[in-house]
Every structure is written in structure tokens, then in C-alpha cells.
């Protein structure tokens, strides 16, 4: 008996063009989506095929008439600004009718799920908090102004589409009440007897997500709700461990809570969605960071938002998907850096020469981008 005969006949097959051998086949469930290879991530349809699967809508639903409220972490501000510049109706813009609301002025600083929940509880449920919790980025204390509460309520009730971005699970809270601050505690008011740093747990964040969903559905039952997770890492941790490992834990807690919440709730709520901005940035692009290793390269951000626009928004996007993809790949080392500048300046022959020794997939990608950009010119 030859070695391996007891395991059954040797099966030979290919996966993504690579030869494979096995003595057994395995039942992999009703849904089986393989992790992409690096080659899989070269093509312009990489994000559509390997990241958005299971999360994309059947058809674009955001039109210029859709009322949008977007807040949470700093990544929510990118979404708000992008959509507003393209004449979509973002209600909580600083220069808009509800520009005095905290979700307009400081929405990018509400990065933990407690801070997001507080805005819904305060504005829609009239909840009062025992402590003053809200400091802006300049450490100025913001009070529970009734006029601002009513403006926030009006904006939230007018919204057709909520985009809520979570950023971190590390929080500062009041020891006596357990209530959580927007941000860290300003140095001049910090009191170790009153203020406590901690990492909010998976169960806490899951509970907060459920409460946010419950309140929205109570007051605005037909609105669409989208959650996202910001890829922007912690600037620092207050834990006695490295910031890199603390950030990994912080994002994992939030992503796990989101996944459990969405898995349980989406089957019963067709208007509940997730946009995988975190996965696009972290898994698709390699050299994604600016030199400070916190800010995402603008070309990558623009690609994430261009993809969002192609998937979610009606009308013709400002930038073609192949164009945005090539631009981001040039900025992150996936293509020669000069390729996009050649395309942008109309030096199409130079762009083709720059990738002449690259793979067929990359040459085809540059050709697609060239055709898109030529169509915009004429």
C-alpha cells in the first residue's frame, strides 16, 4: 500500500490558478468565501468581490434628496465632507441649518459608542446626565443646552439615513456615576478620585449598539442606519502596554460587537447596514499610512469614498472607480508612483510604458483608468 492510499485517491485541482493536491474534500458550509490572494487584490473589482460581498445594497439608495446625519469618529467627518461637496444633503454640516448642534460642531470627537448613544438619549429621549461629560477638542465644556437639544432632535428626526462611525473602546468615566466622557478629561479638571480610565467591553458596546438601534427605530422607524468602524488608530493609549497592541484590542472589541449586533439584527431589519471602510483600508492597501502612521493617505481615503459613492449613491460619481483605484495603488506602492500623474496630465503613452514590465492585470487596470479619464475629457 502506498503512503496516502488509506486517505483515499489523490485529488488534483486549482485555486486561483495555483495547483493544489488533497486526499479529501471538505464540506465548507452553505456559504464559503475564501480569503483573497495578493493577486486577487490587484484588480479594480477586488473590493467588490472580496470586501463588499454580503454588505452592498441591491441598488444605490442615497440621492441628493436624502437627508443624511453622519457622526462618530473623525472618519465620519471625512464621509460628511465628501458627500456634502458632492451636493448630497448632510444635515449636520457646520454651515447648515443645524450647524450649532454638537453632532455638527464636534461630531468627529464622539468616537466611543457611549458618546454616540448619549446624543440619541439626550436629543430624542430627553435623558439628563448627572455629570457634565462633554468637552470639545479644545477642552471647552459644553453644557446641556435645551435649544441645542431641540435642534439636535429636529436633525435626527429629519434624517433618512444615519451613518455612525465607531472609533475606540478606551474611555474615561466618572467613578461615582459610571457615565462616560466624550474624550479624555482635561488636565486642569482631572481628579483621580472622580475620573477613571478603562477599556469598555464587548458586552458594553453591544448593549450600546442595541440601544442606539432601539431609539432610532422608536422615533424614526423607516430610516436607514449604517455603522462603520474607523481605521484610524489610537494616538496614544492610557494602558500600561504598547499603543499598537492596545489599538488592536480596541478595534477588535468594536468590530466583534458590531458583528454580533449586525448578525442578530439585520435579518429582521432590512434598513440596517455596514460599510467596511476598516477592512478596505487595513486589508486591501499595504502602504496606507502617512508618515505619522495615523492619518490615512488621502488617495486611499478618496478611493474608499469613491467606492462608497459608486455603491450607495445615485447619479454619476465624480471619479471613475478604475481611476480612483489606480490613484490609490500608485500612492501605496501597488503601481509605479508616476503612473497616475502621467494619466492625469494626459501622458497616456508614458503611463503605459511605466507598467510595460508589470503583470497583465496591472496593465489592463491602467488601460481601464486611461479610458475612464479620456471619457471625462471629451
Annotated model-derived regions:
Residues 1-378:
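Extracellular glycan-modifying ectodomains
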Amino acid at each position: 500500500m502506498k503512503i496516502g492510499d488509506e486517505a483515499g485517491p489523490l485529488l488534483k485541482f486549482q485555486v486561483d490558478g495555483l495547483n493544489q493536491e488533497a486526499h479529501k474534500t471538505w464540506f465548507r458550509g452553505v456559504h464559503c468565501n475564501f480569503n483573497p490572494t495578493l493577486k486577487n487584490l490587484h484588480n479594480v473589482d477586488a473590493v467588490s468581490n472580496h470586501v463588499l460581498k454580503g454588505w452592498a445594497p441591491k441598488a444605490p439608495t442615497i440621492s441628493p434628496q436624502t437627508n443624511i446625519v453622519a457622526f462618530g469618529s473623525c472618519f465620519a467627518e471625512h464621509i460628511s465632507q465628501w458627500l456634502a461637496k458632492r451636493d448630497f444633503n448632510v444635515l449636520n454640516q457646520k454651515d447648515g441649518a443645524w450647524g450649532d448642534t454638537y453632532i455638527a460642531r464636534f461630531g468627529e470627537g464622539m468616537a466611543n459608542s457611549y458618546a454616540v448613544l448619549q446624543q440619541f438619549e439626550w436629543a430624542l429621549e430627553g435623558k439628563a446626565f448627572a455629570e457634565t461629560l462633554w468637552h470639545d477638542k479644545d477642552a471647552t465644556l459644553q453644557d446641556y443646552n435645551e435649544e441645542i437639544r431641540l435642534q439636535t432632535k429636529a436633525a435626527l428626526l429629519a434624517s433618512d439615513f444615519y451613518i455612525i462611525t465607531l472609533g475606540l473602546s478606551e474611555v474615561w468615566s466618572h467613578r461615582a456615576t459610571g457615565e462616560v466622557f466624550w474624550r479624555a478629561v482635561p488636565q486642569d479638571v482631572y481628579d483621580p478620585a472622580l475620573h477613571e480610565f478603562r477599556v469598555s467591553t464587548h458586552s458594553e458596546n453591544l448593549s450600546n449598539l442595541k440601544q442606539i438601534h432601539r431609539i432610532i427605530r422608536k422615533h424614526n422607524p423607516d430610516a436607514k442606519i449604517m455603522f462603520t468602524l474607523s481605521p484610524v488608530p489610537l494616538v496614544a493609549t492610557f494602558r500600561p502596554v504598547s499603543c499598537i497592541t492596545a489599538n488592536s484590542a480596541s478595534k477588535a472589541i468594536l468590530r466583534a460587537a458590531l458583528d454580533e449586533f449586525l448578525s442578530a439584527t439585520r435579518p429582521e431589519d432590512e434598513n440596517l447596514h455596514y460599510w467596511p471602510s476598516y477592512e478596505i483600508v487595513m486589508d486591501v492597501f499595504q502602504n496606507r499610512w502617512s508618515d505619522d502612521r495615523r492619518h490615512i493617505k488621502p488617495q486611499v481615503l478618496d478611493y474608499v469614498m469613491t467606492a462608497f459613492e459608486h455603491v450607495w449613491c445615485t447619479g454619476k460619481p465624480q471619479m471613475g472607480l478604475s481611476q480612483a483605484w489606480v490613484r490609490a495603488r500608485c500612492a501605496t506602492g501597488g503601481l509605479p508612483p508616476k503612473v497616475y500623474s502621467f494619466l492625469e496630465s494626459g501622458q497616456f503613452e508614458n503611463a503605459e510604458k511605466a507598467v510595460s514590465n508589470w503583470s497583465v492585470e496591472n496593465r489592463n487596470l491602467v488601460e481601464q483608468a486611461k479610458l475612464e479619464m479620456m471619457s471625462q475629457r471629451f
